[in-house]
Design a protein with these regions (language model features):
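Short, surface-exposed coil-to-beta transition loops
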Residues: 56-58, 119-122, 143-147, 159-160, ...
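Phosphate-end processing signature that detects enzymes handling 5′-triphosphorylated RNA
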Residues: 133-137, 141-148, 152-157
Length: 185
């Protein structure tokens, strides 16, 4: 892909330099944003399923960066667990009370080895709203998931809102307020 621009003298020139520079800036911004999320988080979440009453749940999320390896892409490990599981996971077996997802950042996509609602691998397309917020859009096993994640107050807090459609019907809306417990930086 090339960008056309005018030199101001009536001629148009093509350049891929502009696109390459934009791609480098975008990739650097994404790596920096993911780096800001590394650490242990306490998540207070509220789930809305169809017409049911809201359900509150607390869990912990630990995000760590893995060694880059030969691929040249940055990889991350997402671990989560609940200390008080209640009956939330018994009533909803597609949800996991603990688990791990390994994901690799490749350009504007996050390649997940598994997904939260499924063991299937998946690709999340990433859009950057500003330096503090990303939007992830994923499709796997008839699920369409839209997640907004925003870092707040110099990365002490995160706000996540997740909308999940199954077979084109909105099934789950989640609100997560997360507080950083441990920052390895």
């Amino acid at each position: 892909m090339a960008i056309s621009y005018s030199s101001g003298i009536g001629r148009t020139k093509n350049s891929s330099v502009g696109i390459d520079r934009l791609r480098i800036d975008f990739d650097s911004n994404l790596r920096r944003w993911f780096g800001r999320n590394i650490g242990l988080w306490h998540s207070r979440s509220q789930y809305f399923f169809d017409e049911e009453k809201a359900i509150n749940l607390e869990m912990y999320i630990n995000i760590s960066k893995l060694n880059q390896g030969d691929s040249g892409f940055e990889s991350y490990r997402f671990n989560w667990w609940c200390e008080d599981e209640k009956d939330f996971f018994i009533k909803r077996p597609t949800y996991k009370s603990k688990g791990e997802i390994i994901a690799q950042l490749q350009g504007h996509q996050l390649i997940r080895h598994s997904s939260y609602l499924s063991d299937s691998s998946g690709i999340s397309n990433i859009r950057q709203v500003d330096e503090h917020e990303l939007i992830f859009e994923s499709n796997y096993d008839n699920w369409h998931v839209l997640e907004h994640t925003r870092l707040i107050d110099q990365d002490k807090f995160r706000s996540r809102t997740i909308y999940s459609w199954f077979n084109d019907k909105l099934k789950i809306v989640e609100n997560h307020h997360e507080t950083r417990i441990k920052n390895p930086n």
